[in-house]
Each structure stands twice: as structure tokens, then as C-alpha cells.
Amino acid sequence: MRATPSTHWLDIRTSLEDTVDRFSTLLRSVENRDARAVGTWSIADTAAHVREVAVLNSTWASGAAPPPEFRVAFDLAATVSIDEVSEVNARCVAAAPERDPCALAALIQERVELMLYLTAGADGTELVSWLGGLKLPLTSVLGHTLSELLVHGRDIARAEGRAFPIAQGQAKLIFEGFLFPLLTAADAAGFGGERTDAMRPVVCELRLKGCDRVVLVADSGGVVVEEPGGRPVDVHVAADPALMWLLMFNRIGALGPTLRGQVKVWGRRPWRLRRLLQLVKAP
């Protein structure tokens, strides 16, 4: 049975509160803030980016004005496509030079707690402006914040030789509370960027453990989410949602989980999954 928006709302709020505590504790215990965490970012840079996410998402969620140092990036964020989000990230990280992990832990926790406080009277279905001017349910903005804390918490922990696990239930909330609403939002195709080449639809049935089955249909107009049974499927994917989220963010390779049976792919055109994953992107 698919969870109602109010159920997602309460569960995401609880998970976000727990995760920001865990993330802040991790940051306060960092031994080498200059260690490489992801791409060219150090642990300190990654934490500064998470602060940016907390600031921008709390601003969108509450309808308040951003802090002055984030004003330019906030205005830019309203106009970008997904391929231009990296420019927003770069501006934010440059505009806010704090790199002390303990200080960043406090700033991130303060912002997430403020977001939870200011949205306590909402039910999660309210539409708010987000990246690229998309209108998303409030639940999805908090869901994106949860995703960033979990994915980048894992980046930071791995740089220190530690673990920062993502629970199956948390990943389920991210898929159902953030990704699927993002893909079905008005003008989601525009936010997804230019697709110059026409393409045949890629139809994928996604079977995530603990989630209802959904069908993702990608073509030159974007990606939509459908109920199963409406059209022939090219490729079926079965996986744990936490593992699938890390695959989609290129945090783990597909070969190992596939050989271990943690990810199963089958169907009449399984090779088309690669094209779908190129199109199903989340900031």
C-alpha cells in the first residue's frame, strides 16, 4: 500500500531530525578536514556544500529571505537546469568560506532544525518554489535535504575510514517523497535540460524493496512515472532502495552488487537501462 503524503511528511521529518544529529556528530569527530571526500571536494568543502543545501532548502521551505552571502546563488538557483546546479554549488561554497567542521556542524544543524520548526504546522503537500523554479511539495524539499545529508555523510565517513549507513526505509522515503514527485513536477522536463536528439521511449519497471512497483518512461520529452501494466517494459530492475540510490549517484559500481544478486536486471532490452540512468538525475 502506497503511503499517503501525510505519512511521508511525518516520516521524513523524523528521519531528517535523526539524520542531522548523526551528520553533525560525524562532522564534530572529523580528524582530517582536508581529506578528499568526493570529486575534488575535501571533507570541509563537502560539509560547506551541505550547509548550502540546508540554507537554500530551508529558505525555499519557509518562504523567507536567504542570508546575504547566499543571495546571489539563491537568485541564480531559481533559473537553472539540472546541468547548471554545479554553478550554484560553486558560488555558494565560494561565498561562505567557513571550513571548520565543528562550526559547520552547528550551522547545518541549526538550519535543519529551523526548517523543521518553521514547517511544523504544514502537512507537506504545500507547493513551494525550488531549484529551476520547479514547484515541489514541501515534503520533497525536506526529502532532498535528507538525501544530501545521507549521501554526503557517507562521503565524509568513507574519507575517514568509517561508515555512515543509509537505511532501507530512509531510501524509500527519498524515492517516494523526493525523486518521484520531482520527475512528475510541472516543467520537470525543462529542469532536466536540453535533449537535442529524439529518442525512443525507455520503459523500466522499478521494483525497490519495501516500495510499490513503478514504471519509469523516459523519452525526448523527459521522464514520467506510471503504474505498472500500461505498456510493454524494456527492462526490469529489482534492488534495495539504498543501494539503488547510491548507484544513481555513482557512489558505487553496478558490477559487484549485480554479481552478488543485490541488483537484478532483466527484460527484453536490458541494455537500455544505461540510457535511462543518464536521464533520471537528481541534484
Briefly describe each language-model feature range.
Residues 175-219:
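A glycine-rich beta-turn/hairpin centered on an aromatic-Pro dipeptide
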Residues 1-9, 56-120:
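Short, helix-capping/interhelical loops that line the mouth of catalytic, cofactor-
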Residues 32-77, 131-189:
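Short, contiguous alpha-helical
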Residues 2-48, 57:
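An N-terminal domain-cap segment
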Residues 24-36, 112-142:
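Acidic interhelical loop/turn segments
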Residues 229-283:
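C-terminal interaction segments
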